[in-house]
Amino acid sequence: MAFNKLAPAVGFTVALAALRLASVGASAPPGNCTRECGGLEIPYPFGIDVEDGCQLSDRRQGFKLRCLDRGGRGKRLYYINQEVLEISLEHGQVRWLNNISSYCYNATAGEMEVNSPPSNMDLEGSIFRLSGTANKFTVLGCKTLAYIGDTDNITSYTAVCGATCKDGNLSLLTNGSCEGIGCCRTAIPRGLENYRVWFKSFSTRRCSYAALVEASNFTFSSTYLSSSAFVDAYGGQAPLVVDWAIGTLQGETCESARAKPESYPCVSNDSLCVDSPIGRGYFCKCKKGYQGNPYLPYGCKE
């Protein structure tokens, strides 16, 4: 009986604490938000687009994701058309799938042509930027020259990567090596928000491939040049990493965010703010020795 008398008082105390916490930081999401899609966790500040209040409010798009069943594969998590594979709060990153560009010979037309959805992307107006540390522009082929550049012609960024095979001899290729023989890869600058891929035409009938790919997830195989194994292995798409941050439109920093305590999102007592490596915005993380969600009250735990 003593427990029953105490329960209302405990509930009132917890509710009061939550109200006080909400008054000094960003509002916590409702407790009935969908936090899983297709077996993938959806941690706040991200949420499903049709559930109001379940994601952080930001003037740029990105925290609202979609949980859809496309092609009868069961529900998957998407940002627009990109299938999301993982969301990292600690590193301020998201992994998703992106198209691989295939450049193959068309016997009817008698020329090389791109025969798959291009490996292009435009993240303008979103919280995301292409990771310059996690991704590499990767090109596969013999007698292949592929380019990557921005789509807005503002930063005038262009890079080229070439792959060749001596006399077209695939037996000379080395599995695991991507140093220009059958495979080439190069870095991209930090903070890119868009890119496109194109090929230079050569007299060849082998398919060539190019994509911006998560470097740690790719290992070259000679079979990628003698067959469609590369495209088949990834279903026409390969993992890509994007950085994300809060307040990128306003160019906010941790200092400016702390100056507005009523909307400061790092609400866990054991959280800290980190200025984003993409140059604008910030994200929250748990202090060393703690794990969890820094965007939730008491979300960081030992």
Which residues does each PLM region occupy?
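Typically disulfide-stabilized, N-glycosylated extracellular/lumenal ectodomains of secreted
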Residues: 2-302
